[in-house]
A protein has these predicted regions:
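Primarily recognizes the serine-hydrolase "nucleophile elbow" in alpha/beta-hydrolase
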Residues: 88, 137-181
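Cap/lid segment of the alpha/beta-hydrolase catalytic domain
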Residues: 58-59, 64-144
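Glycine-rich His-Gly loop
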Residues: 40-42, 65-70, 159
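N-terminal pre-domain segments of enzymes
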Residues: 1-17
């Protein structure tokens, strides 16, 4: 029973990411960073940054950085992870979780961004699904990039991002590694 629900959930949450690139910049020598968005549940767009080496050969491994409460794609650890792993020859995607960065419609700061009222019976089911779907769609987006080897995509989570990643790893079989702290 649970395995059939799990397979159905994975199938329903996986669809074309309809990604759009916006602008690229070079934060440090040898690393290119692109501001991109990718699609997720209910037509929402997820703002993200993709870091990659300026020059490379062949397909590269990729890493998704999952941020926690009060963290977004510009957090120091997201930036540092992007630079570090891109310099090491990988592709890194870090994004704004729901309620953070560009997805903080009420412009609250820190964890107060999550104080939006959602009816209690629906909150856990809706929010956890949306948050996990952001990770799953990040995998879909990276799998479509020409420089990424889809068989070598992993993820790391910080703080609340580590909890989100542990749930995503349970349902997203395309993630080859998960690391949380």
């Amino acid at each position: 029973m649970w395995s059939s629900r799990w397979r159905l959930w994975r199938r329903l949450l996986r669809y074309d990411a309809n990604s759009k690139a916006s602008q690229a910049f070079e934060p440090v020598q040898g690393v290119i960073a692109e501001r991109v968005t990718y699609g997720t549940e209910f037509g929402m767009r997820v703002p993200a940054i993709v870091y990659r080496p300026r020059t490379y050969t062949g397909k590269l491994p990729a890493l998704i950085v999952v941020n926690g409460h009060g963290g977004d794609k510009y957090s120091w650890y997201s930036f540092y992870s992007g630079i570090l792993y891109a310099r090491g020859g990988g592709v890194v995607l870090t994004y704004d979780p729901i309620g953070e960065g560009e997805r903080n419609s009420e412009r609250k700061s820190g964890t107060r961004a999550h104080d939006k009222l959602i009816p209690p019976p629906e909150m856990a089911r809706r929010m956890s699904g949306l948050i996990i779907n952001d990770v799953m769609q990040a995998v879909s987006y990276l799998s479509q990039r020409p420089e990424v080897d889809p068989s070598r995509i992993g993820a790391m989570g910080y703080s609340m991002g580590s909890f989100v990643l542990s749930l995503a790893c349970a349902v997203e079989t395309r993630l080859r590694a998960g690391w949380w702290r």
